[in-house]
A protein has these predicted regions:
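Alpha-helical membrane-anchoring segments
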Residues: 1-309
Length: 309
């Protein structure tokens, strides 16, 4: 997140927001979040429970002009849940595999937002983060590399893309952490260091059933509470500085893995870890992806028999 090499403020601004980068980082983000969207969708099953008009989250709009009334009147009510679920599933699959290019990413964003309108569940904050990521990706060409399309994979070299969508995603991640830290700081439980201890004692969010969390754990819980608070408030500043970026991202991975191991937070931990891809150096990531892709292609390329004289 630096302007490296700029000689004037104007050049620094243009380099920071608009310099051209390899498209590989967008492709990796597309695949990672395509998989996460699929997992998030499959978590809202069985379909009859989560998607049916009369499931645990009934479709709203039952008035004379409501959407629910329109679906019932159209005659599609028995199949509506399957139609919406299947359409969303296909959009996510196409995005993950790179089929349809940006059209698949746009369709995934529409389907993801539509899922919230159709079904007020899931309750995980991961859904909101996924929406923010998909919004950032629609502004970049994510389908140039790492696709199942032979035509796309034959494009050499891949066209470079503006870094602007990546910057938007980076700032959204920073805003997520900072706003979460401010919200936590307004809670007395976070200020007195007891939030993690009480979360571990809560039978709804605790992953392992503990009737009583041992008092010996209280010191660790207090340290973890304050550490989480400091990390979230400081994340935007630490990740912006190159010298502390790697350590900050590693600390974030540890934080989210710890939360996933001890608490029922849904896919949120994995979604946030995946956003760290946006902070990796695009050029180095492109080199690594190309090396892995070429090595894989060489492994499956049929060998050419040697020609005799």
């Amino acid at each position: 997140m630096s302007t490296g090499g700029a000689t004037t403020p104007s050049e620094g601004w243009n380099r920071f927001w608009f310099r051209q980068i390899p498209p590989h980082v967008y492709a990796v983000l597309r695949i990672a979040f395509g998989v996460l969207c699929l997992l998030d969708l499959l978590g809202a099953t069985p379909i009859s429970m989560f998607w049916d008009l009369n499931g645990i989250a009934p479709l709203p709009g039952g008035g004379p002009l409501g959407f629910r009334s329109w679906v019932v009147a159209s005659g599609f009510a028995p199949a509506a849940a399957w139609m919406v679920f299947t359409g969303t599933l296909l959009a996510y699959l196409c995005m993950t595999l790179g089929i349809g290019g940006n059209a698949a990413v746009i369709a995934s964003l529409v389907a993801h937002v539509w899922q919230t309108a159709w079904n007020v569940l899931p309750l995980s904050a991961a859904h909101q983060v996924l929406t923010a990521v998909l919004f950032s990706l629609v502004w970049a060409d994510c389908g140039q590399v790492l696709t199942v399309s032979p035509l796309q994979n034959a494009v050499t070299p891949a066209l470079r893309q503006s870094i602007a969508p990546l910057r938007v995603l980076q700032y959204q991640v920073c805003l997520i952490y900072f706003s979460s830290g401010v919200s936590k700081f307004s809670s007395e439980l976070w200020r007195d260091g007891s939030a993690i201890y009480y979360a571990m004692s809560h039978n709804i969010v605790q992953r392992f059933p503990l009737d009583v969390v041992p008092l010996s754990f209280q010191g660790v819980a207090t340290l973890t509470t304050y550490g989480t608070l400091v990390f979230e408030l400081a994340f935007p500043f630490l990740v912006a500085w190159r010298r502390t970026r790697v350590l900050t991202l590693l600390a974030g991975v540890g934080l989210h893995l710890g939360a996933w191991v001890t608490l029922e937070v849904g896919p949120f931990s994995w979604v946030m870890i995946a956003t760290y891809i946006a902070f990796l150096p695009p050029e180095r990531l492109a080199t690594l992806v190309d090396e892995v892709w070429q090595r894989k292609a060489a492994r499956y390329r049929p060998s050419t028999p040697s020609q005799g004289l």
